[in-house]
């Protein structure tokens, strides 16, 4: 089952409801704006912006929304953004890594700490749980764009891909690479004229914990509270249950 594998956290999924889609768009817009503010609006020299735009396109964000986010990042009076990662524990050995992009660190850490406290978790120090995860490059591409699966597999493995999965139900190929080979796999996808619908560096759990229904419900309330925070870009966990 997908929920019991390393693929569960990285899959690009279709059919999000309107509220979740709007929230996700907001996070994508913030990442585009932050990327431009940090390194300019030229995707040829700003890989962070390139990934952010790629992911926005993969989520079917309208071009005008993307352009507005780029223009906002180019404006001098737009606040500077900082990327920060928090680590903590939920109930029953669940480890959480929370990636944020914020223009106010004090606000963000206060809100993240409050979410952990309210839902029975505890915010830890840097390094408190990250050793339980591996930092990996991940890509999702439309299966319909792939003409020769064997050729794709050979080319990507040669470029440094560690694993490739064809998710026939969702209609995607999912690819995992090491942190070091992320750029070379991305370049090979360019050479193959395959544009990912999502591409990012993620935290993949080394081992996972199975939760009973009651505990899972409690932990998911914490994860959802964190994800509802506009400053939070992504929450990673080591739950084995299918959390979709």
From Swiss-Prot:
A Gene Ontology term for the protein's cellular component: cytoplasm
Predominant subcellular localization, coarse grouping: cytoplasm
UniProt GO MF annotations: DNA binding
Q: Which Gene3D superfamilies match?
A: 1.10.10.200, 3.30.70.980
As for subcellular location, the record says: Cytoplasm
The Gene Ontology biological process terms listed for this entry are: regulation of DNA-templated transcription
| Sorted UniProt keywords | Cytoplasm, DNA-binding, Transcription, Transcription regulation
Q: Which SUPFAM superfamilies match?
A: YebC-like (SSF75625)
The answer to whether the entry has keyword Transcription is yes
Q: Which residues cross the membrane?
A: none
The family note in this entry says: Belongs to the TACO1 family.
Q: Tell me the NCBIfam families matching this sequence.
A: PRK00110.1, PRK12378.1, YebC/PmpR family DNA-binding transcriptional regulator
Name the record gives this protein: Probable transcriptional regulatory protein Aasi_0624
Q: Which organism is it from?
A: Amoebophilus asiaticus (strain 5a2)
Q: What is the lineage of its organism?
A: Bacteria, Pseudomonadati, Bacteroidota, Cytophagia, Cytophagales
């Amino acid at each position: 089952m997908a929920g019991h594998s390393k693929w569960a956290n990285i899959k690009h999924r279709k059919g999000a409801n309107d509220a979740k889609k709007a929230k996700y768009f907001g996070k994508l817009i913030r990442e585009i704006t932050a990327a431009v503010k940090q390194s300019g609006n030229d995707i040829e020299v700003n890989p962070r912006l390139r990934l952010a735009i790629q992911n926005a396109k993969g989520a079917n964000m309208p071009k005008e929304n993307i352009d507005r986010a780029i223009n906002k990042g180019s404006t001098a009076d737009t606040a500077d953004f900082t990327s920060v990662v928090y680590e903590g524990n939920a109930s029953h050995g669940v480890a959480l890594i929370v990636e944020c992009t914020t223009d106010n660190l004090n606000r963000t850490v206060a809100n993240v700490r409050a979410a952990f406290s309210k839902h029975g978790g505890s915010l830890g120090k840097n390094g408190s749980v990250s050793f339980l995860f591996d930092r990996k490059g991940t890509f999702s591409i439309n299966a319909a764009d792939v003409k020769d699966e064997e050729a794709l597999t050979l080319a990507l493995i040669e470029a440094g891909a560690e694993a490739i999965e064809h998710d026939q139900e969702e209609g995607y190929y999912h690819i995992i690479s090491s942190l070091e080979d992320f750029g070379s796999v991305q370049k090979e996808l360019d050479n193959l004229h395959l544009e990912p619908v999502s591409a990012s560096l993620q935290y993949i759990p080394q081992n996972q914990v199975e939760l009973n229904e009651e505990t899972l419900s409690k932990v998911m309330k914490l994860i959802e509270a964190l994800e509802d925070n506009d400053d939070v870009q992504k929450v990673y966990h080591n739950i084995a249950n299918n959390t979709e």
